[in-house]
Each structure stands twice: as C-alpha cells, then as structure tokens.
Amino acid sequence: PSQEVLDKYKDLVAATAEFMYSFATYDELEGRFVLKGAIPAQETLRAADTVNPPFELSYWHYAISVAQKWRERLGLERNLQWDEMLDKLSPLAYQDGLYLAAETATDTYKDIRFTSDHMAVLGAYGILPKCPLVREDIMQNTLDWVWDNWNWGKTWGWDFAMTAMDAARLGDTEKAVGALLMDKRTNTYLPNGHNYQDARLRVYLPGNGGLLTSVAMMCAGWDGSEGENPGFPKDGNWDVRWEGLQPMP
C-alpha cells in the first residue's frame, strides 16, 4: 500500500488489533491465549459455551499479523505484546485427525448441531491464508469428511464458496469446482442473479459475494499458489479466461 493508505488507516488497524489482543484471554496454566465469549461464524454454537472456534482463531492470527506488518511499513517497531499472542495463540483443536467445530465441541462429528449451518472450520484455511495454527493434512481430512457427511440441507449460500476456497488451497481442484456447482437449494442462482435460499429469503448477497470471491481466487491464485488458474482441474476440460484480478493473500 502507498504511504497515503498506510497513514489513512493506521489508527483503525492499530485500534482493531488492540481490541483483538484485549479480547483474548491468557491461560497462565497452559501458557496460551484462548478465545471465548465470541459468537462464532458457525451460528449453531453458543457464544457462552464456546472456546477456541477454528475460523476465529485463524482470523485472530491473520489480523494481528497484518497489524504488525502495518507497523513495520510505517517504520515502527513490532508490538511485543502482539508478537507474544502470535506465538502463543491456541492451535486449532482436533480429534481423530479431524478439526473440531470448537475446542469445547468434542462431539462435533456425533451431534448434528455441529455439522449443520456454516462449516466454518474450512474457512480457517480457505477464506483465510495458511497460518501456523493449521495443519494441511488434518484440514484435508476435515474437508473430505465435510464433503461426504455434512448436513448440506442446512447450509447457506456462501458455504459453497468457502468450501471451494478451502479445496483450492489444498490442491483438491475437483472439489473446488464441485462445491461451486453443487446441486443444493441454497446454491441456487435465479435468472436475475440472486442467490435463492428459500421462499422467505430470495435475496442473499453473501452467496453472491462468496461466489465472485472464490472464482476470482481460483483464477488469479493466492500467495504461494503456482501456475495459471490454480483452482481449476488440469484435465483439459476447462478453458478459463479472466482479466483485471489480483491474487488473494
């Protein structure tokens, strides 16, 4: 970003990072920062009972990392407290090789409440770039389980885009395309372009935004991706053309 952009948003970035730092709780006994009391993106989890939801943990790490880079670009030293959080933020909780909906959701794969709504765990390495909290092998296992077993009848329009972005980053391009083309009611787009959810909700802009973002990412790539159109299968069946897009982080 230009110096003008750095100066314009420096106070907003710093204040956001300070809030995020203050919101987390430091567990003295285990020597780690934990997140609790937040309303998770997967709305079937209750904020009062939820500790360390995976998407939010990854978002904390990403946002604090961006705030540190902002300081460096301004010629400032890194904030030592923020660095401590980056080093000691809780990793994503997993069980039997699968990421949990939250550290406290130990019945993630037994209770349909945890396998309905947004599969936000995939957003931890889909919407967001890879961070040290995420292991790709466990995320691939989780994607495969979600693909085969999720309660897809209880999803929302942007869930398909989130799944596609996770699959693309993992190199599972067949699932990336398959997610965007999945034949589910909430993945319906009407002739006027609106993402139909049900008779009550015929306009759902998060679905449109998710579709546009995921396709752009699959075309232009992301930091560390290789080759052209990295989110599409290289089986000779795709002729992808685009212009004016920038890679995702």
Model-inferred region functions:
Residues 1-11, 53-223:
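Active-site core of glycosidic bond-cleaving carbohydrate-active enzymes
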